[in-house]
């Protein structure tokens, strides 16, 4: 598949409309600018063409994510990054075009945070494997994985499939957009925020490209 001219697909009216509707369905909290999902439609009506042109000319600049801590089952804290609703809209538009491309590379028995797949399917597959005589289950958690993702390595993997420089540029900009912690800005030179684009799994799809290809 030719992936050298994906930005025009991302900027198509149909794709942008679908992205807007998905962000509204996802709801979620406001980012650092305080804009709510309910305010997004009016904002895009006034500024949508400006955003499209900024993306087309590589001038779009994502805002920092807002740091939020949520409790983990083991008693610790998990850091989430909440993007602005406008950034979520752009991320969603990008993801809708990229996801079908990368889905073809993922392992058939990987069920986490993928379209048309769910935990119940994973359980059924595990039962099938147990019935085939497999008796071991290994539970592995990669400690602080999202906090330590190497940007250059991630973008190298990403670039093996995606050849559109405009798309590569905007994805990297989201990686280095920074984070606001108690009104203090911090650079993000490593790692990727959990939250935003796919708030239900708390991991942007470009991280799946890093860990999930077969």
Residue locations for each model-derived region?
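N-terminal alpha-helical targeting/anchoring segments
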Residues: 1-47
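Electropositive, glycine- and tryptophan-enriched low-complexity nucleic-acid-binding patches
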Residues: 91-109
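Amphipathic alpha-helical blocks
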Residues: 39-61
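Conserved polymerase palm-domain catalytic core
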Residues: 54-69, 73, 105-117, 121-214
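Duplex nucleic acid-engaging cores and interfaces of nucleic-acid transaction enzymes
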Residues: 86, 90, 127
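Short, compositionally biased low-complexity segments
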Residues: 11-28, 65-67, 96-101, 131, ...
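Conserved phosphate-binding loops in nucleotide/dinucleotide-binding enzymes
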Residues: 79-84
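Short helix/loop capping segments that flank catalytic or ligand/cofactor-binding pockets
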Residues: 19, 90-91, 147-149
């Amino acid at each position: 598949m030719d992936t050298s001219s994906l930005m025009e697909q991302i900027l198509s009216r149909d794709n942008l409309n679908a992205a807007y509707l998905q962000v509204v369905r996802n709801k979620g909290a406001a980012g650092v600018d305080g804009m709510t999902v309910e305010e997004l439609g009016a904002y895009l009506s006034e500024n949508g063409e400006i955003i499209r042109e900024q993306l087309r000319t590589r001038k779009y600049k994502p805002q920092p994510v807002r740091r939020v801590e949520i409790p983990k089952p083991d008693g610790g804290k998990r850091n989430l990054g909440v993007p602005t609703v406008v950034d979520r809209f752009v991320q969603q538009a990008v993801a809708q075009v990229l996801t079908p491309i990368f889905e073809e590379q993922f392992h058939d028995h990987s069920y986490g945070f993928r379209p048309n797949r769910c935990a119940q399917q994973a359980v059924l597959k595990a039962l099938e494997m147990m019935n085939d005589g497999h008796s071991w289950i290994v539970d592995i958690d990669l400690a602080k994985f999202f906090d330590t993702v190497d940007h250059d390595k991630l973008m190298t993997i990403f670039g093996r499939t995606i050849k559109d420089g405009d798309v590569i540029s905007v994805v990297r900009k989201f990686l280095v957009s920074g984070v606001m912690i108690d009104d203090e800005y911090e650079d993000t030179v490593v790692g990727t925020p959990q939250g935003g684009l796919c708030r239900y799994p708390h991991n942007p799809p470009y991280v799946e490209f890093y860990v999930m290809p077969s």
